[in-house]
Amino acid sequence: MSSGGRGSAWRDRNVEHFVRSIVKAALSLLVLQAPSTRAQELDHIAVFLEFCTGTRIAEKIVLTAYHCLENRIPKSASGSGVKVKVTDHLISPLAREMKIDVRHDVALLYLEKSLPAEVPIVPLASRGQKFERYVRLGYGFHAGENGWIDSNALGKLKVDEVFFWDKRPSEKGKMRFAQPANRTCPGDSGGPTLGLDNGHWYVAGVTSRVLPDLRHRFSWIVPLIQGKELPDYARYCGEFYTAERVTENLDFLVKGVQTLIARHPEPLLRAAPPRKVTARRRK
């Protein structure tokens, strides 16, 4: 091979290596540097998943809770009035059921096609980011004033500002929020708890479980002793809810997006055939 040929091959390999490194870096930052979501877009952010809720974090990828996929994978995701088929999923390898909650309660769904542009791609919170306020979105059941589910209807969006249950919330582990006016109930699982930073929303948490306080946790003892029918606590929305902290799952979320994109490569666009140009006679 001539020196010119060797030089050309060397340049080609370097160009290929450079392109691959750029693509890899872009994929790694895809989730973290999604376009900011302005405050007025709240009504379009949450994605309905038949029996849970989710958030669009990449072009065809929806973030939800691991426990939403334990028994059955959602068949479709709906946003802005459009239903799209779910074709693949990934569960955090660290996810596991605990006594009263789920650890690393996150999973990803891959859609057959993109949701409408009205459903924004929401960026994930970054480590150390501080928020002015929090809002929880969910398509779950609705509860009455006493906290018990009073309707079996799912699919009606709830948008509520939420506040920490703890007076001094921890910087690590699950976030615990007091119940808002429209209580967090089953069906809200997997939905986002959004944090507001400088006029833009970020996914700070993923709704995990609704839990009762100690008083309600042991309230079944009295009716048990009295021989009365026990309350159906599966229909109770609890005093607070937990949200999986996004910043403790960034490694899985970034690599998970990369994996799903690699599994489903986009077909190359074919060049449109040249149109026939016909000459028109002037009148």
Task: Describe these PLM feature segments.
Residues 20-28:
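Sec-dependent signal peptide recognition
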Residues 35-39:
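Sec/Tat signal peptide C-region and signal peptidase I cleavage site
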Residues 40-78, 90, 94-97:
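Catalytic histidine site
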Residues 46-48, 73-84, 131-138, 195:
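Short conserved beta-strand and strand-loop elements enriched in small hydrophobics
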Residues 52-53, 190-192:
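Beta-propeller and closely related beta-sheet repeat lectin domains
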Residues 57-69, 154-156, 164, 194-283:
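C-terminal subregion of chymotrypsin/trypsin-like serine protease catalytic domains
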Residues 103-106, 110-183, 207-223, 246-250, ...:
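Chymotrypsin/trypsin-fold serine protease catalytic domain
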